[in-house]
């Protein structure tokens, strides 16, 4: 057992099984009915079974993290095209594809902050990042599964003793160090705990 198992992203050999579990998760399906392109299905008889069947067909060929991220990329591209007037990137040519980096950014949206960075990296043939996410955002297992499929690792922000807080933060620090120094994988973290809700997100 790896000491990072409780916080690490899912690995390639876990991806398909997790996706199939999600296609049978009542709470996840309920979320899809309430939001997005499948909302019309909720009016049909056996709607949950129908949606589960659709999802299983979509994910049956996804067996690794890269394939999942390719699937996810089209969603992020759509967000950029439909909601951002001007998206520019500078300095990407200075990154070495064989080196892991620590990316620290301001924080407005836990999904899009890292997604926009990773879209840029992917389009420039660079490896995507492991992304830090607080467990306070992952009370539902399906939410945790989605984030860990997309290379997120968990920062434990539960109310604990000072000793337990130190241990959990130390484990996260070790994971970050191992990713960058030993595996040459990059990591994204927000510059502070909690996103800025007033637009004032300067360091």
Regions found by a protein language model. Name each.
Residues 72, 81-203:
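Soluble catalytic domains of membrane acyltransferases
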